[in-house]
Regions:
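Extended, subdomain-level signal for the structured scaffold at the beginning of enzyme domains
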Residues: 1-97, 101, 109-119, 129-177
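Catalytic nucleophile serine of serine hydrolases
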Residues: 105
Length: 177
């Protein structure tokens, strides 16, 4: 499968957007990736719409060198996790290594706090447009696209396009390894 041998971390915490989390995780697993759910501490959390989401491991216990990519779903979770340096440092390290990072909906809030959006094209929930622009990104109103190693998705309705771009970016990363 196109992502065999890749390990992808997905950020999770209370209030994560259920579909952005679960559909993306399922698509990555379907493509052959090993997926780990990372958050502040191992636990079972509730998504924004009530689905259970397992947090497998604390983000501080994950070496960024041990993962091949990262996904930052939206919901209410990004506004909470962006406040923790352990989260933003993890995101910044993966970005600095040039590994693919998928960012959808409000996930851009964590990317802003990790200081990885300046100079790039971005999208997400319209509610964070000003935040992205103020952080130095260019706003693009498209369902999903790649800008270097960042894969952007707009909102829940754009999950299929986001997953296509994300899998393609991870497959390209795998081929270049």
């Amino acid at each position: 499968m196109e992502l065999d041998g890749l390990h992808v971390a997905v950020l999770a915490g209370e209030g994560v957007e259920d579909l952005e989390y679960w559909v993306t995780v399922m698509r990555l697993r379907e493509a052959g990736a090993k997926v780990s759910s990372v958050g502040l501490a191992p636990a079972t959390v509730r998504g924004k719409n009530g689905l259970e989401v397992p947090v497998d491991v604390a983000v501080g216990d994950v070496n960024p060198d041990a993962v091949d990519g990262l996904v930052i779903p939206g919901g209410h979770m990004p506004d909470k996790l962006r406040r923790y340096a352990v989260v933003t440092d993890f995101v910044a390290a993966i970005h600095a290594a040039g590994k693919p990072i998928g960012i959808i909906c409000h996930g851009g809030l964590i990317a802003i706090s990790a200081r990885i959006v300046a100079g790039c094209r971005s999208t997400g929930s319209l509610g964070i447009k000003d935040d992205l622009v103020n952080a130095g990104a260019t706003w693009v109103d498209e369902p999903a696209f790649r800008d270097a190693n960042l894969v952007w998705g707009r909102v829940v309705e754009d999950i299929p396009a986001f997953c296509r771009e994300l899998v393609a970016a991870l497959a390209a990363y795998r081929a270049a390894k």
